[in-house]
Amino acid sequence: MHGLLLAAGLLSLPLHVLAHPQPSTSTSLAGRAGAVDLNEFRVAHRSSYTSHDEMKKLPSIASFRQGTYLEVATELVKQTMPNMEFRLVDDHYVGDSGIGHVRFRQTMHGIDIDNSDFNVNVGKDGKILSHGNSFYTGPAPASNPMVKRDFIDPMQALNGVRKALNLPVKANGAHVENMSEHKVMFKGTSGALSDPTAKLCYMAKEDGSLALTWRVETDIGDNWLLSYMDAKESSKVHNVVDYVAHATFQVYKWGLADPTEGKRDILTNPWNLKTSPLTWLADGKTNFTATRGNNAIAQYNPDGGNDYENNYRPSPKNLKFEYPYSPDMNPPKTYIDASVTQLFYTSNVCHDLYYMLGFNEKAGNFQVNNRGQGGKGNDYVILNAQDGSGTNNANFATPPDGQPGRMRAYIWTRANPPRDASFEAGTIIHEYTHGLSNRLCGGPANSRCLNALESGGMGEGWGDFYATAVRLKPNDTRKTNYVKGGWVNNSPKGVRMYPYSTDMNVNPLVYTSNNKLNEVHAIGTVWCTMLYEVLWNLIDKHGKNDGPVPVFENGVPNDGKYLAMKLVMDGMAIQPCNPNFVQARDAILDADMNLTKGANKCEIWKGFAKRGLGVGAKFDPKNRTGSNQVPNECK
């Protein structure tokens, strides 16, 4: 679950329930008494990434036989990891940039190694563009654990997780139902929003060994956890992943970051029929008269509960979603219709824009009805306005494709009267982008690939980057600075360490700043700062389209702003599971190589190098090495 800040009690593992309060050094469970710090259970960085430039140095790749992108990808894994057992993950697709994305999961004795993945990117020419790899290469277990059933039963695992993490789940009288050979469901529990499950799997550990675990899944609202309990010791949790990282419409239209930037307008049929052909108010089976449709369902959620379908949502006559609102109105519930409408509008525009840039059905986007275009449906975004489960934050939960995303927008109490997160577009875009990055990085079927500290930080940085790119104004230049979350937080400094700026005197952050940072929002500020440099380099080269949608020429946005947004998005799908900054940088360069044949290589390199992520920069979680160097051809 990801939130805007670092709400007291959230962690930014793969879900996305983080928001944007001032950075905190603590990320614990839901802020409850006795809460456990989930940072202690983060997944370690294990991925390698072989970029396009590195691939060209491997002559053996050129001898690959021609075939489908699946066959080419499978052959690469077989040659790279001979004699290893793996399976094809059923979420492969060809993106709108022509790249075939194929992912494999390593297995041992027929059991998944849950954090051992191999992703292959096949270019439009049928050749390998790049690949990422986190396969386990240590000693294999001597015997198949399924033969002697040499592990604790799943109920012991659930109880062990409950105790170790102090979860509000009760299992007295609960029983186990088999779902498959390695997976069970717990029936009769209380305290979770859905029945917990457990799956037997291995986890590759930092010390190079392999642990047999029960992956216990518990959705408790503000945290949606995958807890890897040792299958032989019911008191030992190895890792934890959190999925939550916390008509006419009268709205602040797209591009206005908050109520200080303009007035509300009445917009007629604001949807884009190319990306939402069913409109925002239908799902192909039902035409709705409330804030519900194929992409999202928005409602008032004052008690913070999970029964969203029966909650109140505006349903006006003649589809006129026109309601009074002023930032001076109080209490917030007096303008709930306007709040739900604004949240519904902003999230749907996000859906439509991201669809145009490549986040479509095959890529794992959020829709009930995918209209036969690939991917898994039945997963609109659940949008809870004025959610009563918290304050001063917002969050987004991103389970795998086919399960609904969930956004919670809270009331912020740092102003008088309080301010509603639904009206700060930057907050909503940031949260929706958690859904984007979690579905693309690792593939639609795996929402566990932004769990390490640096990759989790990039998840926050991408949210800020897209929110900032969207709010750019016609007269902005590279000298324009922007803060994040200034309005909701009632602070001119916003909720980040520094404004986003290309001026080193205003924002001095560089790659090695991460050596002193241990919180995802702080690390995300470094990442977004780098992307802001790249953004302006591309705008200075290609100009800036100030319209609400990109204009494409041969599949490439013809301006720098949308080109940057496109390349960053393509990079998310190319990079390995749990990437670091260096790997994510290389993935963006490879995205440009695929899309434009590397026409923007130097603009990208110079943006990263200015902030210490140049040629020669190296990742070490405790001692990163910075570099301001660019390739010789860019000097």
From Swiss-Prot:
Pfam families with a match to the protein in the record: FTP, Peptidase_M36
GO MF term set: metalloendopeptidase activity; zinc ion binding
Keyword terms, alphabetized: Glycoprotein, Hydrolase, Metal-binding, Metalloprotease, Protease, Secreted, Signal, Virulence, Zinc, Zymogen
InterPro entries the record matches: FTP_domain, Fungal_virulence_M36, Peptidase_M36, Peptidase_M4/M1_CTD_sf
Glycan attachment sites: 287, 475, 594, 623
Active-site residues (renumbered): 431
Name under which the protein is recorded: Extracellular metalloproteinase 1
Taxonomic path: Eukaryota, Fungi, Dikarya, Ascomycota, Pezizomycotina
